[in-house]
Regions:
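Short, structured "edge-of-domain" segments at secondary-structure transitions
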Residues: 1-182
């Protein structure tokens, strides 16, 4: 442990324009699901991600996943195994939500699979892992929010587009979605 005046240890050397958006702890046996803004999901095992030292710069996602031009990872879900009683709630920028059984994404393809069908100009902003009875809250840029139980959205298949989660007006769009626990 550190005493007073401790300075800590530098964990990572970053370039000026780089920043750490998310940090995950995973085993080599864990399944990592990477969701992109275009609605695709890439499935990798932990051992397929390059290991690096404490001060390494890391590896760009485009060098690990076959991403298209302009495509980026917006959400990551890590699990040891796929459970039948768990779900994933997908939320798009235009307010669409989709609830899919977690087990439905236990498919591996090198190029990824389509997890949600998106409308023109829409993009996936978050994926939330739920237990089947969680409350979800959506928030928009103009300060609107809605909270609903995930059971209000029926489970759908992989190719479904989802249902409207929040009504948007003007140029408003969804900026965040999370699980809400009382």
């Amino acid at each position: 442990t550190q005493s007073r005046g401790g300075r800590g240890v530098n964990a990572q050397n970053l370039k000026d324009e780089d920043y750490v958006k998310s940090l995950y702890v995973a085993s080599t046996h864990d399944h990592l699901l990477f969701f992109t803004d275009k609605g695709r999901v890439h499935h990798r095992k932990g051992y397929q991600i390059p290991e690096a030292g404490r001060t390494a710069r890391g590896t760009a996602m485009v060098n690990i996943l076959p991403l298209e031009q302009g495509e980026s990872v917006t959400a990551t879900v890590i699990t040891r195994e796929f459970f039948e009683d768990e779900y994933l709630m997908m939320v798009t920028q235009k307010g669409t939500v989709k609830r899919i059984p977690f087990i439905a994404l236990n498919t591996r393809r090198k190029t990824g699979i389509r997890a949600i069908t998106l409308d023109e100009g829409d993009q996936l902003i978050n994926v939330i892992r739920t237990n089947g009875n969680d409350n979800i809250i959506l928030a928009t840029r103009e300060g609107m929010a809605i909270c609903f139980n995930e059971n209000d959205v029926r489970p759908m298949g992989r190719d479904a587009a989802g249902v409207r989660g929040i009504m948007l007006t003007g140029n408003d769009y969804v900026i965040g979605a999370e699980k809400w626990e009382e």
